[in-house]
Amino acid sequence: MKEVSIIIPIYNVEKYVAECLNSVISQTYDHSKIECIIVNDCTTDDSMDIIDRIIKKYQSDNGKMSFNVINHERNMGISVSRNDGIDAAKGEYVFFIDSDDYLYPDCLKSLYDAHLMHKDAELIIGNAYNEMLTSKQFDINNIKVINNLNYLFEGSLAHYTVWNMLIKRNVLNKHNIKFKTDVSVSEDDLFNFHLYSLVNKAVIIPQITYFYRKNNKGQTLNSKFENAQNTLAGYISILNIYENELQGRCYVGKSFFAFNLATRAIDFLNKVRNEVPEVELQEWPLRQIINKIQKKHIRNCRPILFLMTLLATKPFEGIMRIRFYRRYFNRITMLFWKPSVLIDKILSHIQK
């Protein structure tokens, strides 16, 4: 059995795909233990021609990494591409990479070495260099072992993306964790919302293993405006899922995910109104789901989380327009984090 299945969705990335794939075949880890699954989502540029040339050259040099190319008959989106990659994977771990990013040479070796030290860990997360922030993702010098998975949702060890981590494939299969294909916003958030709630142990390593390139990933604001109602409906759909599953393990972490998404939805709503006033959006479903989340916090004896969600309701949401608040949003929300985690521990102890 392969140890790692690398999944690369491909769509119109001819400018970057060579660097991405070359970084995969340049890994110092044993290539015979790696499979690379490339999902061609009906790319319209020369991406697949570039990929074919690189694979043929690699195989002519007797490279031992195996390749599986999946071709879509029509463009279906990144979520379907990733799901097809999961279905095709045979490795012990699954690893996602965006096709305009690249891996550092020791990426898989560093991650798998951490697995050998912590064989019961279901997630092994690498450090990343963010081109946009010109900084590394985690400011750590030693391996961090996380047994309280709340800490992956928020704080200095939070990981919001699906790339740059080894994910136990049997966890995905056992719980049927897949990407939601009928929304075009926050797909990674929703995937991780389910994943983090179902694993027992994660490890974060200090080594930088991944280079993240911005490259206009996801929808641009203009494209969102073109179909604003569907975008807002996507936010509401995911918030409904969050509210329905807001219970049990990782309650605090899941609550922060829900709050962050609610504030993004409100911010989007306000931008549409300011910049495209002719577009009429129905906001009451968004207000309704935020209200349901607040009531759930009250029923579950979570006063700090209730106070936090007030920031996403009228009239308090007006502070989102204040530059100071927007600049220090993460620091301000972290004021609610520690007391919420403390209350969570107390309630868990009482229930036991």
Please tell me what each predicted stretch does.
Residues M1-I236, L342-Q351:
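Nucleotide-sugar donor-binding/catalytic module of glycosyltransferases
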Residues S32, D52-D61, D113, M117, ...:
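Polar/charged alpha-helical tracts
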Residues D189, V252-N260:
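Alpha-helical scaffolds flanking conserved acidic
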Residues T209-N216, L221-V252, R264-Q294:
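Catalytic core of nucleotide-sugar-dependent glycosyltransferases
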Residues F225-Q229, F256, R323-R326:
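Short, solvent-exposed segments of well-ordered alpha helices
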Residues N260-N270, F306-T309:
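Short, hydrophobic/amphipathic alpha-helical patches that form generic packing surfaces
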Residues N274-K352:
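Membrane-interface aromatic/basic loop that binds lipid-linked glycans or pyrophosphate carriers
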